[in-house]
Every structure is written in structure tokens, then in C-alpha cells.
Swiss-Prot record:
Signal peptide residues on this chain, from the entry's feature table: 1-21
Organism of derivation: Edwardsiella ictaluri (strain 93-146)
GO biological process: cell division; protein import
Pfam families reported for this sequence: PD40, TolB_N
Main location: periplasm
NCBIfam families associated with the record: propeller_TolB
Cell compartment(s), UniProt: Periplasm
Function: Part of the Tol-Pal system, which plays a role in outer membrane invagination during cell division and is important for maintaining outer membrane integrity. TolB occupies a key intermediary position in the Tol-Pal system because it communicates directly with both membrane-embedded components, Pal in the outer membrane and TolA in the inner membrane.
Protein's recorded name: Tol-Pal system protein TolB
Lineage: Bacteria, Pseudomonadati, Pseudomonadota, Gammaproteobacteria, Enterobacterales
GO cellular component, as recorded: periplasmic space
Length: 430
């Protein structure tokens, strides 16, 4: 826990402008069919009101996963704060087989002790499945709640939780000297801050695998350029600024390489830079356009978009050469793919019959599933545990962020109030 806090402190950089959060998750579909669970409001052990609603944050996290449906506090048969106070039969009567209870104790030094227990009400009634406590300052109370959510989620599903992750995205605001902003926020939209402001467009942010850097495209020099920015100190390293197009950066999972697309010789082609030496080598060649690289877990193979068959489709190729293998065969065109962290599937923008939606391609069975029903969907990015996808879509006159579970059942949106939001990128585990 202490190590994780130190890493997050490094990300809460002093140079960044902290904002009032402008995006919040609004669930639109799928929670009713999820597993019911009880998350009892945490007992506040101090004077006045609690500085954060820890139980509410945990309930929201579990609800946002699409796998759980926390019942409303008004429906709870009791509101215990410790496992010994839980009456299992009262909860199982509501179809609930697990309950989260806890309390928050203020300390004389200004810190808070957050403790929780996950209680089994069905299999072994009254037993504690997992428990923990964290001593934190006020600014880390939400992080402590997300940590508890991660532990509860993993205990109940066997899947590592991703509630302590972040999202990067580009906001185009309405006017001002710097209308384009690259921002980072907690996955749920809280603790938003600005990484970079620009008078010219910013595009395609991509996280380094350790979460310490963002690569992105900027047009501040008068033409496109690829840069890598270190979040802890704001330092910017220019990677590529060749004539014509420089775009679509993607860090390799081992952190040693950056793939991107250049059109310096005419057609768009893929290149890979060794980040230690700065050496760049070309991966694809020919007259077709090859762009939007995404890495497989081995850091040796790329999936990418190519129009070599006429319309854009997704292909796979080893960075050391060879023949590109076509992966997509359904839909009129497929593009902007991202390979899952385990390499078992990819998500992409799939177009068919005039519609443009996010689809999932199972790389084992080659089965394709359309996940979304929103309008003009773009730039999907997968959570590090592979359970959710964030993407942008057109709503009204602007672009907003949307969430969909990897099975397509759960859907939510993250509306912004101060501009159009594009190019979401989900962080690795932090």
C-alpha cells in the first residue's frame, strides 16, 4: 500500500493544474442483471460529517464494473459496521451473498484509519472473506476506497480490480488561448488535472507500461510531432517530427520500444523506435497505408490498420519482418484496434451498413461481437484487467466518453461539461 501511494504521489505533479472534475460515470444499461451485493455505509467515528463517503465510493466502483449491483441503503435490512454485527439470513433473504462493512476513524495527527470487511452471508455465513485497513491523509481517502474495491472485486471474481487506474484524454474547450488540453483523471472522472495545454490540436495519448509517461501527437511546431512527456516533472522528449504525418504512438508492453506511423516516404508505414538508443527502423513497406499499431503481449508482434486489400482492415505482423496476416473479415472496414493485455482478443472500430461501432474480435475463435450501439464510435481503449472498454462517440454536437463491458451488457457514459472529449487511453495498473 505504501509503495502504491508513493507512485501515485509522483503522478500528482505540482506543475499540473488541478481542476474540478468535469466527467462522471452515468450508467445507461446493464446494472439490473448484475450480481446483487450489500455495501453498507461506513460508520464515521469522528465529530461532524465524514470527509468522504467511503462506502459510496466502493459501491460505485463495484457498480461501474458491470458485474455487481449494490442495493440502495434504504433497502438494507440492517447497517452494521463490523462482521460480528452482520445477520446473514437477513441479507440472503434479499438474494445477497456478500456484504461489505467498515468504518473510518480520524486520528489526532490529521490522518484517517479506514477499515473494511467483506462478509460471506451464504456459503459460510458470517465468515470474513477479506479485510484490510489503511492509514491515510485526507487527500488519499478516495484512493483507499478504490484499494478496498480492488480487493473486494478480486476476491469475488478472481479478476484483478482496476479501480486505482486512470484515463488520459484530450478535451477541446470552447475558445481561450489554449483550447486543446491533454488531461488525466481517475478512471471515474475524479482528481482530474491538465498534463499539457496547446493552441494546436493534441491527439492519440498512449501510456507507458509503468504509467509514468504519456506519448502523444502535437501540432505546436506547425506540423505533427510525436512527443513523450514524463508526468512527474513535465519533461517533454520529441520522438519524431518528420515531413508529413507523425502519429499513432504505442509503447511496447516491456517498455523498451515505441511503435508509430510515419508518411515521410509517401504512404503511411509503421516504424519502431528503441527508446534507449533512439534508433528507428521501418516495419512495413509498400504502397498501402499502414497505421494505428497496437502491441501483442510479447512486444514482438503488432496488430495494425492497413488498406492493402482496398478498405481498412486489421492485420498482424512481426516487427522483425515477414508477411502480414489479415485478422478481420467481417464488416466493410475495421480499424483502430487495441489488443487485450492477455492477447486473447482485440477491440476495434468496425463499420457495416453505414454504422460505426466498437466490436470485439476473439483471436482464438475469430468470432466478432459488436459491443456498442452509440453513434460514430472511435478510439477504443481496454482496461488493464480486460473487463471494460472506454471509447469516444458523437453525442449531439460533440464528442463524449463512453464505457462498455467486454461482453457488451453494461454501458455507461462520462459526459463532460466544458468541451468535447476524445482519444481516451486507459492506464496500466498504477
Amino acid at each position: 500500500m505504501k509503495q502504491a501511494f508513493r507512485l501515485m504521489v509522483g503522478l500528482l505533479v505540482l506543475w499540473a493544474s488541478v481542476l474540478h472534475a468535469e466527467v462522471r460515470i452515468v450508467i445507461t444499461q446493464g446494472v439490473d442483471s448484475a450480481r446483487p451485493i450489500g455495501v453498507v455505509p461506513f460508520k464515521w467515528m469522528g465529530p461532524g460529517t465524514a470527509p468522504e463517503n467511503i462506502g459510496g465510493i466502493i459501491a460505485a466502483d463495484l457498480r461501474n464494473s458491470g458485474k455487481f449491483n449494490p442495493i440502495d441503503a434504504s433497502r438494507m435490512p440492517q447497517q452494521p459496521s463490523a462482521a460480528a454485527e452482520v445477520s446473514p439470513a437477513a441479507w440472503t433473504a434479499l438474494g445477497i451473498d456478500a456484504v461489505v462493512v467498515g468504518q473510518v476513524q480520524p486520528g489526532a495527527d490529521g490522518s484517517y484509519l479506514v477499515s473494511y470487511q467483506l462478509v460471506d452471508t451464504s456459503g459460510n455465513p458470517g465468515s470474513v472473506l477479506v479485510q484490510n485497513q489503511y492509514k491515510v491523509t485526507g487527500q488519499w481517502l478516495r484512493y483507499a476506497a478504490h484499494t478496498a474495491s480492488d480487493e473486494v472485486f478480486e476476491k469475488l471474481t478472481g479478476i484483478k480490480g482496476a479501480f486505482r487506474t486512470r484515463i488520459a484524454y484530450v478535451v477541446q474547450t470552447n475558445g481561450g488561448q489554449f483550447p486543446y488540453e491533454l488531461r488525466v483523471a481517475d478512471y471515474d472522472g475524479y482528481n482530474q488535472f491538465v498534463v499539457h495545454r496547446s493552441a494546436e490540436p493534441l491527439m492519440s495519448p498512449a501510456w507507458s507500461p509503468d504509467g509514468s509517461k504519456l506519448a502523444y501527437v502535437t501540432f505546436e511546431s506547425g506540423r505533427s510531432a510525436l512527443v513523450i512527456q514524463t508526468l512527474s516533472n513535465g519533461a517533454i522528449r520529441q520522438v519524431a517530427s518528420f515531413p508529413r504525418h507523425n502519429g499513432s504512438p504505442a509503447f511496447s508492453p516491456d517498455g523498451s520500444k515505441l511503435a508509430f506511423a510515419l508518411s515521410k516516404t509517401g504512404s503511411l508505414n509503421l516504424y519502431v523506435m528503441d527508446l534507449a538508443s533512439g534508433a528507428i527502423r521501418q516495419v512495413t513497406d509498400g504502397r498501402s497505408n499502414n497505421t494505428e499499431p497496437t502491441w501483442f503481449p510479447d512486444s514482438q508482434n503488432l496488430a495494425f490498420t492497413s488498406d492493402q486489400a482496398g478498405r481498412p482492415q486489421i492485420y498482424k505482423m512481426n516487427i522483425n519482418g515477414g508477411v502480414a496476416q489479415r485478422l478481420t473479415w467481417e464488416g466493410s472496414q475495421n480499424q483502430d484496434a487495441e489488443v487485450s493485455p492477455d492477447g486473447k482478443f482485440l477491440v476495434m472500430v468496425s463499420s457495416s451498413a453505414g454504422a460505426q461501432h466498437i466490436a470485439k474480435l476473439d483471436l482464438g475463435t475469430n468470432a466478432t461481437q459488436v459491443l456498442t450501439d452509440t453513434f460514430l464510435d472511435e478510439t477504443p481503449s481496454i482496461a488493464p484487467n480486460g473487463t471494460m472498454v472506454i471509447y469516444s462517440s458523437t453525442q449531439g454536437l460533440g464528442s463524449v466518453l463512453q464505457l462498455v463491458s467486454i461482453d457488451g451488457r453494461f454501458k455507461a457514459r462520462l459526459p463532460a461539461t466544458d468541451g468535447q472529449v476524445k482519444f481516451p487511453a486507459w492506464s496500466p495498473y498504477l
